[in-house]
Amino acid sequence: MMSEPKRLHPVAVILNLCHTIIQTIKNIILPFFFVYIVNSNHTVRFYGAIALGVLFIWLVAASIIKWRRFTYRIEDDEFRIEEGLFVTKKRYISIDRIQTMNTSAGLVQQIFKLVKLQIETAGGGKEAEAVLSAISVEEAERIKEAVFKKKAQRRENELDEERLEAEEELDPSVEVQEHYRMNAKELLMAASTSGGIGVIISAVFALISQLDEVLPMDWLFDKFSFLQHASIGIYAVLIFIGLFIAWIFSIAGMMFRYANFQIIKKEQELVISRGIIEKHQVTIPLRKIQAIKIKENIIRQLFGFVTVSIVSAGGGDREKEEGALTILFPMIHKKKLPHMLRTFTPEYTLEENCRRLPRRALKRYLFRSVIFSLFLIIPLCIFFQPWGYLSVILLPIELLFGYLAYKEAAWTINGDRLQLTSRFIGRTTAIVLKKRMQVCKFSQSYFQKKGRLYTISTSVKSSSHMEELTVRDVGEEDAAFILKWYSYEKADG
């Protein structure tokens, strides 16, 4: 009976303990540990060891108490959770507010054949409303079935279409319509061009800065003091080796993250799964999709590959590597993209023939590309001669990016579908349906008014905020056409 209070699997004690230890290490233990190791006073070491032992025992006891006091049940059309170490906290989540329930399995869960269930609600923000960290696969399916059944019962008096959708969610025998699995070439391309090298380098510098505060680093500097007299060539080689190692680590991380990536389309929903060490699975109803975003960085564009994301209202992948987005295709060739969108998101198809910006918008793109750099370049050229003149190299590079941004900015309308393309460093194409647009804004600055240009932006609802899609400096006549298209729908509505 789902109305009876239930506890998590005892493995939740291990998960709670690991999480608490990691948080404690971040906040307390790391500096204490290094001070304890460096300090040669035996009395300090003795009491330090006792303190560590007492703290560990307390963390184990707290994890067991938390597990014992955590219960969940479904009662009176609510998902009820009671938890707390000393004070009992009660959370009642209305079944109507539950949008999606996603499962994932880390290394510990996989060993014991368990899953983590995340319950997400409308307007729940970036974090899941409730998390059951260790339950059996069968229990997760029972919870999903019970929730979907209650939602279906409460919607019996609504439109037939909504009732059918609820029945499809409930029906476990729905046949798989389409299936896609990312191949090895796409996985390698996604990993090697992900830009994760920046994250690795930032993490290394952050770690070094933390170690420098608690450990004397003079001995390390002494060992590498010979580099003070090294040539520029040696420095260049060392920097290259460091960047190459960071790049290899970023590739490995991305390959573990997106290995076994696959999409299964079942009637009116997409089931997306990925991962080796930690497996993730999310379910997105097609009716929750608000927009599709197609992104290309410079390297991927050269090879003809793109990344496709979904903006959804509720649900999605909570890791937020793309902000409020869920990855639909981590890496796919542009030639395959139109067919794949028609297959998995038939309402959101890609248009090849788009309307470009007028010629008079070019100077605005070129001006915006260099204006902020000029405030840096001019002082460098004046006060840091002659090396400051090297900063002038930035100008042609930025002008090139400004020209590309102008050249690739575009829009098109096909029926009730609006497609916007813009570029900053990488190129982004957004596809949105008229009925999903929360607002459509047409703004015009003083200088845009002189050039008869407008900035067009529209917002769609995502799980945590409003996602804005924008194209700058659209011609006045084009802006009027888009406004008429959007206003016509509102008048009909």
Swiss-Prot record:
InterPro entries per UniProt: UCP026631, YdbS-like_PH
Keyword annotations of the record: Cell membrane, Membrane, Transmembrane, Transmembrane helix
Regions that span the bilayer: 18-38, 46-66, 188-208, 232-252, 370-390, 393-413
Membrane-related topology note: Multi-pass membrane protein
Subcellular location field: Cell membrane
Cellular component terms (Gene Ontology): plasma membrane
Family (UniProt): Belongs to the UPF0699 family.
Protein name: UPF0699 transmembrane protein YdbT
Underlying gene: ydbT
